[in-house]
């Protein structure tokens, strides 16, 4: 499971709109869709369904949103802890 797939999935789950999610992620819609489809294949089913021009989470999508939201939050905490552990002396110097 790759983190960009999780990020793309969570962004679409939040917006329920592939166009807006693609804009927010600074990628094209096909670039956004492929990783989400692969993520769904990893879990064994579709994460979203389209109905009359609207995007909805499937039951699998709703369940995975909970779990993957925690994965995303944990990865952000890990990054913050790593930065804190390294301290200010390890920050990159920009000239």
Feature locations, PLM:
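Alpha-helical linker/hinge and terminal dimerization helices associated
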Residues: 42-43, 63-86
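Short helix-boundary/capping micro-motifs
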Residues: 12-31
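Residue cluster at the C-terminal edge of the helix-turn-helix DNA-binding motif
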Residues: 15, 24, 37-46
